Design a protein with these regions (language model features):
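Catalytic alpha/beta core domains of metabolic enzymes, predominantly
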Residues: 64-72, 77-195
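Active-site beta->alpha loop and helix N-cap motifs at the rims of alpha/beta catalytic domains
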Residues: 1-87
């Protein structure tokens, strides 16, 4: 925290402080409290310690941590300690009030789309989506995702053939381990993707 305070003194825009949170609920809630006390902005919650827990237990765990501190969900690929999480998990996760973002790193297009669709269908426009899919960075950043989120309204004289309600979501940035080495170039690439 002291290093970040020093770095912020020389910046026009302050750093966003996201700390890691791990462990089962007792440990994770303690870590969330520490991040809060250190004036971080949010905590990236690893579910690795609960890899065998049923979804109901995972949601209860996430809610307990979110009661203490703003939460960034983390979808980590199974090959490195994560687990497959269905659309239904992410739809319920989106209902947790203090969720501010999700880092998606399942390295699987369909699992990534499950998260994006769950957030789009939840109506939570305040949840930011970040890619951690090192194998698909640029496409994740460039692709708009559009989903039908509601039925069409009744026909009217102005709209005799109403269309279903849709929602578009975009992945707004990358939270990638290797980007910490090439930060300047990564930021330039992100800006080019957004242009």
């Amino acid at each position: 925290a002291e290093e970040m305070d020093r770095a912020d003194r020389d910046r026009g825009v302050p750093l966003v402080r996201i700390g890691g949170i791990a462990g089962k609920t007792d440990q994770a809630t303690r870590e969330a409290g520490i991040l809060r006390d250190l004036k971080y902005h949010a905590g990236l919650l690893s579910l690795g310690a609960m890899s065998k827990a049923p979804d109901d237990e995972l949601i209860a765990h996430c809610k307990a941590v979110a009661e203490i501190f703003p939460l960034v969900g983390f979808y980590l690929q199974p090959a490195v300690g994560g687990r497959a999480l269905p659309y239904s998990f992410w739809r319920r996760f989106a209902e947790i009030e203090n969720v501010v973002a999700i880092k998606m790193a399942p390295f699987n297009r369909y699992q990534t789309l499950d998260v994006v669709r769950a957030i789009a269908e939840s109506g939570r426009d305040d949840i930011a989506l970040y890619t951690g899919n090192d194998d698909n960075i640029v496409m994740d950043l460039l692709t708009p995702h559009r989903f039908v989120v509601g039925p069409p309204g009744p026909p009217t004289p102005a709209t005799p053939h109403p269309v279903p309600k849709t929602s578009e979501r975009r992945i707004v940035g990358g939270l990638l381990g290797h980007w910490s080495v090439w930060t300047k170039t990564a930021v330039e690439l992100l800006e080019r993707c957004k242009a």
